[in-house]
Structure formats: C-alpha cells, structure tokens
C-alpha cells in the first residue's frame, strides 16, 4: 500500500522498525537504547508530546533528553529550509539511505506567506517519516545553536 520495499530494505539493513498501522512506543524507546548502546551519541530528541505521551515518558525514563517540540508548520519550515540549503550547496549527506530518498520523493512543498514552507505527502498512503525526522533534527540543532550563542554572550560579559 505504501510502496515500501520491505524485504529489500530489511536485507540492506535499513528497516529496523515494524511497518504496522500503529507503532508501539516501547519499540521506539528500545530502538533509541540500541543506537545508544552502539555508541551513537544522542544529545536530545525532539517530539511532539501530544502524539504519544507514553513515548515521551518512556524516553525520559530511559535517560534521554527529550524536548517537547510541537509540529507547527512555521517552525518546521526553518528545518525544511536548512535541508533545502544544504541540498543546493551540495552538502546534504544522508548516507545514501534508500528510505530517505523514498520519503523525500513523497514530499510536496507549499509556499506560504513570508517564504514559509508547509510540506505534505504527495500520496496519502505513502510515508514521509524519515524526512520528517530529518526536519525535526534540523529544528533541534538550530534551536540549540541559538541557545548556545546566547549563553556564550552571557558568559563572556
């Protein structure tokens, strides 16, 4: 239905989570734990708590710094623009991940006022999860960058 080549992605090591209609929040928490155990440094995770409060609580209980990050289009626009800029500059690196390319091909951008971008699925049954996660990660990085610059200014005074 969503045109994901499940067996191919599984064979290539890209498919690490289930493809069920709903997601068990504990499965995602365990995935993050496994990534951390492999040595991947995870500074923060942004998540809109209104979509799964149990996941939010589970991540905090597992020791992750999870930040409430509502999915406002005007906020996600900044992350989208960051990805767009890196792509245009030839500096977008996504490990050649087929799932990222698949999700990117399912995204349509809609220009709003003041050059804001709202994006949506091209096909309702197709997925954009990996792209959406990349946008969220860009938003977290940009917000942290701003906070660290403010802190440096305050400490240097």
Predicted regions located by residue number:
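RNase H-like, metal-dependent nuclease domains and their acidic two-metal-ion catalytic environment used
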Residues: 1-71, 77, 81, 94-157
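Short, surface-exposed amphipathic charged segments that create phosphate/polyanion-binding patches used
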Residues: 80-89
């Amino acid at each position: 239905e969503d045109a994901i080549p499940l067996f191919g992605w599984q064979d290539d090591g890209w498919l690490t989570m289930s493809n069920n209609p709903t997601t068990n929040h504990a499965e995602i928490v365990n995935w993050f734990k496994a990534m951390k155990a492999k040595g991947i440094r995870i500074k923060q995770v942004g998540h809109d708590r209104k979509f799964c409060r149990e996941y939010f609580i589970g991540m905090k209980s597992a020791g992750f710094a999870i930040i409430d990050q509502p999915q406002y289009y005007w906020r996600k626009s900044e992350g989208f623009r960051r990805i767009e800029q890196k792509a245009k500059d030839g500096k977008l690196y996504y490990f050649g991940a087929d799932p990222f390319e698949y999700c990117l091909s399912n995204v349509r951008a809609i220009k709003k006022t003041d050059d804001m971008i709202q994006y949506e699925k091209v096909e309702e049954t197709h997925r954009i999860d990996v792209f959406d996660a990349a946008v969220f990660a860009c938003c977290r990085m940009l917000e942290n960058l701003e906070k660290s610059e403010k802190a440096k200014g305050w400490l240097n005074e």
